Amino acid sequence: MLSIDTNILLHAFNEDSPSHQAAYAWITSIQRDEDVAISEFILAEFYGLLRNPAVLKNPLSAEEAVEVVQTYRNHPRWRLIGFPTESRPLHDALWKKATAKTFAFRKLYDTRSALTMIAQGVTEFATVNVKDFEGVGFRKVRSPL
């Protein structure tokens, strides 16, 4: 199963992005796929970016941002995932990874999102930041752009 990072969603939405066309085309190309999962954690981050004037020239209102997020949450073919029923083992693995001397504090949220998706069957992750997600446990991490 494939899941999508926030940066791909943002590029697909933001017409001012140099990567807009490629991201939009890729998102469009997987619309009929049924082996796609969208993470509530990724959507929460996407919501924040949609409202941020440092990210978008014309940030969205709260209502507009939720409307965009809801289009992904209500996708007729894609699976919506949040925390797995039993999240203790996932968080045990997260804190174990966080003890590594080379673990950057800013990686905590991405690692939690990745472990949550993996625990629910996601094997492939599409992101612009491939190196940030390599070695987390996905079988494949790639940039579709």
Segments predicted by a language model, with ranges:
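Short, well-structured N-terminal submotif of metal-dependent ribonuclease cores
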Residues: 1-38, 50-67, 131, 135
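Short, hinge-like loop/turn segments at secondary-structure boundaries
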Residues: 53-57, 99, 143-145
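Aromatic- and histidine-enriched alpha-helix N-cap/loop-to-helix transition segments
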Residues: 38-44, 108
